[in-house]
Amino acid sequence: MSSRIIVGSAALAAAITASIMVREQKAKGQRREGNVSAYYNGQEYGSSAPPQLGKLHNIKQGIKEDALSLKDALLGVSQKAREEAPKVTKRVISPEEDAQTRKQLGQKAKDSSSQSIFNWGFSEAERRKAIAIGEFDTAKKRFEEAVDRNEKELLSTVMREKKAALDRASIEYERYGRARDFNELSDKLDQQERNSNPLKRLLKNNTGDANTEEAAARSVQGWGDTAQEFGREELEEAKRNASSEPSEAQKRLDELKKIKEKGWFGYNKGEQSEQQIAERVARGLEGWGETAAQLSKDEMDDLRWNYENSKKQLDKNVSDAMDSLSKAKEDLKQYGSHWWSGWTSKVDNDKQALKDEAQKKYDEALKKYDEAKNKFKEWNDKGDGKFWSSKKD
């Protein structure tokens, strides 16, 4: 619209200028023609120009022409086109052509509108996406800072405790982790036990003999005696450990290694199975530096329980054997008495059979009694551990 106004204004100025020039040209022509014309009785003769209409007519004519020029400039229609318009035959547009034209214009407007909206929507989406990414990054950063700050505040106490526990564990690990071989580790453990409580040392007797049964028997020596006797044995053992021989801890570990490689022996341990014993020893070998104290305590309790129960069983065996022997002795005495004499030969034969049976029972009872008594004696023997050897039989 603004471009039309500018073009119209320029055309108006040109039209006004042309109108002024036309009026001036007409005025000059009239003056020129008036010079050659003749007047008679107030009328002009010999002139081809139209009669003079006067200044008022000229002014009206100029205004009319100026108005037409202004109209042409505003509507964008040239004078020539207006003059030729009546000569042009008006073409009648059919309804089908008009509908097709409208459809094409509508489709074009729709495509233009859709394309414009799409472009605007895509750009706006990109802009909002960029804004959202920036806001998300900012929020995420603030959230992480808040979480980090809260975690530090809430977990500071726990972390200090965990750090202290870790430091303690690291120190403990360093104590054992610096051991370069098995001997050095066993020496450290042995020294640690001697410095703490010698009564907690178990399986630390002389294990030079490869007989595992005798080693087990020696490990329980002293339980039947007083604490003073047990302390004396521990003192003697400590003196042996101080000698130039391999440490008792090393001997114990070597012996347990052999047991693990060759299998555990199957001596009677009450209700405890061979598999449980082997698992306990293997557990001690795999984590010796950590479980030595607990393993020693478990073994001590276990062996003490077995000792007490085995001793009770031996006492009962001796008592039962003695009762059986007394009964067999009474039967033998009864069947060998004098009041059997004077009976028939058949009775004599039966009497002899009963006497032989009583003698046989007596001999068996005496044998069982002697075995029970010997085993009980071996149990209390502190010299060679024959009790455990006899248990194998």
From Swiss-Prot:
Main location: mitochondrion
Record has Membrane as a keyword: yes
Location of the protein in the cell: Mitochondrion outer membrane
Residue intervals on the Mitochondrial intermembrane side: 1-4
Domain of life: Eukaryota
Transmembrane regions listed in the UniProt entry: 5-22
Disulfide bonds: none
Keywords: Membrane, Mitochondrion, Mitochondrion outer membrane, Transmembrane, Transmembrane helix
Protein name as catalogued: Mitochondrial outer membrane protein OM45
